[in-house]
Regions:
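Catalytic loop of the DD-peptidase/beta-lactamase superfamily, centered on the K-T-G motif
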Residues: 1-417
Length: 417
């Protein structure tokens, strides 16, 4: 509890003060007037808008897992704190909720005279793009996508995602202020050269949630990249793996990852328009790929070396220590009434495919101590014993089953009826 003497003396006054410093100003960071991010030591922001407009320091820490979302806002000089943990939404929604509640509290106790109006981006007339601006066209990347930016003479900018065909093209229009603005006027894009040969897309976005609140996110959204030129053998090696889903094998039996199909698998995909890339990763050699962009905040997070490794006679995809096995290397689940299987060397989870021979059959599993299993159809997890209990499950026709143990040699008895 914060009221306990131990809590009050856990950090020295000097350390508490250091935590509030604007550490983001010490490194690569976009120029910003306002944003929900501005790193301190451990804080996502140490000068959250709009509190800083009143000279009030607001410290923010948010976070998201697959199933839960949290946000903490502290006004240390006013003895006010907001915290929310939700099982839906996002940490940003929680932040907006806390922002509005704290502003209302400050208004009620007389600390501020009025709640500020929503942040507005300056409007400017559309204009043709000068040659200097048009020269910025090309390939740009962050850790989640690679886009091709085209800038037309009339000032229209089109950003097309090359790594996800489900993402629609984004359109912006050049303005007399020198920035590119989307149709709604909620997103402003500019190009920034760092003086050392790197070119960034600087983005200011209005975050607006009806009946909840408004804020702004300022970031370097992309870094300009060039097409890599790996060897023919390296390109062919990754193309041979393209189109295959890789599934997690070294998560624990209680991991959230197995509860959501999205978080338990990873797709390797090459693209004719992006030779030298596998997804957003630059191909280094036959076994290694890496995203070399360096961006602060969200656009550059979760960047890890991607390697193909051999373990215990099988090929795995290693992404920052998380191991995945290709669906092409999975066996079909045994169709006999009774079967026993064991976790392999390394204690990795074992994945199996279900087909027409399994469809409609009921599966019961006798689990080892602390073991778990999960069943998936083509779209989602339909049963995870850690969440749903160890009960019988009807198997889908085109699905997958994973058995998760704690150590090598853990035994699972499978009964099909």
């Amino acid at each position: 509890s914060p009221s306990l003497p131990e809590a009050r003396t856990f950090l020295s006054d000097q350390s508490k003060k250091a935590l509030r410093n604007k550490e983001y100003l010490r490194g690569l960071w976009p120029k910003q007037e306002a944003s929900i991010f501005g790193y301190g030591l451990g804080w996502d922001s140490v000068d959250l808008h709009p509190f800083k407009e009143y000279g009030i320091q607001a410290l923010v820490k948010g976070g998201d897992t697959n199933l839960y979302h949290g946000s903490l806002i502290v006004l240390p000089d006013h003895n006010l704190t907001f915290a929310a943990l939700t099982s839906g939404g996002s940490s940003v929604l929680n932040l907006l909720m806390g922002q509005e509640l704290l502003l209302s509290t400050l208004l009620a106790n007389g600390t501020i005279d009025a709640i500020p109006p929503p942040y507005v981006l300056e409007a400017s007339k559309r204009s043709q793009a000068p040659q200097e601006q048009r020269s910025y066209a090309g390939l740009y990347a962050n850790t989640t996508m690679v886009v091709r930016i085209v800038i037309e003479n009339n000032g229209k900018l089109i950003a097309t995602c090359l790594t996800d065909e489900q993402t629609p093209p984004q359109e912006y229009y050049h303005t007399e202020s020198g920035s590119f603005v989307d149709e709604a006027g909620k997103n402003h894009l500019t190009f920034v050269e760092d003086g050392q040969g790197k070119l960034y897309v600087h983005m200011v976005r209005i975050i607006e949630v009806p009946d909840l609140g408004t804020n702004v996110l300022t970031s370097y959204e992309f870094e300009k990249v060039t097409l890599p030129t790996p060897s023919v053998h390296a390109q062919e090696a990754w193309e041979a793996r393209s189109g295959a889903w890789y599934y997690a094998v070294n998560e624990g039996p209680s991991s959230q990852s197995y509860h959501l199909m999205l978080s338990t698998r990873f797709l390797l995909s090459t693209n004719e328009e992006l030779p030298g890339f596998v997804g957003t990763l630059r191909i280094i050699d036959e076994q290694t790929a890496f995203n070399e962009v360096q961006l602060p905040v969200l656009a550059g997070r979760d960047n890890a070396l991607c390697r193909i490794v051999q373990k215990y006679g099988k090929e795995y995809l290693d992404i920052g220590g998380s191991l995945f096995i290709s669906e092409r290397d999975m066996e079909a689940l045994d169709t006999r009434r009774y079967s026993i299987l064991a976790t392999p060397a390394g204690g990795y989870a074992r994945w199996f495919i279900t087909d027409s021979r399994h469809a409609g059959k009921t599966m019961q599993v006798v689990l080892p101590e602390s073991g778990a299993f999960a069943v998936y159809d083509g779209q989602e997890c339909i049963h995870y014993s850690t969440v749903d209990g160890n009960i019988s499950v009807v198997l889908p026709q085109e699905g997958k089953v994973v058995f998760i143990g704690k150590a090598a040699g853990d035994l699972f008895t499978v009964i099909l009826t």
